[in-house]
A protein has these predicted regions:
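Preference for short coil/turn "hinge" residues that link or interrupt alpha-helices
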Residues: 16-18, 46, 52, 89
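Glycine-rich, flexible loop/turn motifs
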Residues: 19-21, 49, 60, 92-95
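Short amphipathic
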Residues: 10-21
Length: 99
C-alpha cells in the first residue's frame, strides 16, 4: 500500500523526544512510560541510536540506557497512536515529574 493511500491506523507516527531529567530513563521513568503506553491499543516501538525496543516493556526501555540529553524516537501504530504520543510528549516535558 502506498503512503498516500495508507490509513491512519496503519501508518506509523513518530515523535523524537529528548530526555531532560537528570537521571535519564531509569526504572521509575520507564514504568511511567509503560503505564502510558499500556493505556492504549497502539503498538509502540522506541529507538535510541541503532537499538529498538518494545515501548510497553520496562526492561526494554531501561536497556536503552537513555541518559540526560539522549534523543529517543517513539514509533506508534494504531487508531489511538496520536493520543499515545501526545501523552508521552507531556511526560517528557514534565521531566518525568522529577524535582
Amino acid at each position: 500500500m502506498s503512503q498516500a493511500n495508507a490509513s491512519p491506523t496503519t501508518t506509523p507516527l513518530t515523535r523524537e523526544l529528548i530526555v531532560q531529567n537528570k537521571m535519564g530513563i531509569h526504572a521509575r521513568p520507564a514504568a511511567m512510560i509503560v503505564r502510558i503506553t499500556n493505556k492504549f491499543r497502539a503498538e509502540v516501538l522506541v529507538e535510541k541510536d541503532e537499538e529498538q525496543v518494545n515501548g510497553k516493556s520496562i526492561m526494554g526501555l531501561m536497556m536503552l540506557a537513555a541518559g540526560k540529553g539522549a534523543k529517543v524516537r517513539f514509533i506508534a501504530t494504531g487508531a489511538d497512536a496520536t493520543a499515545l504520543l501526545t501523552e508521552l510528549e507531556a511526560l517528557f516535558a514534565r521531566k518525568f515529574d522529577e524535582v
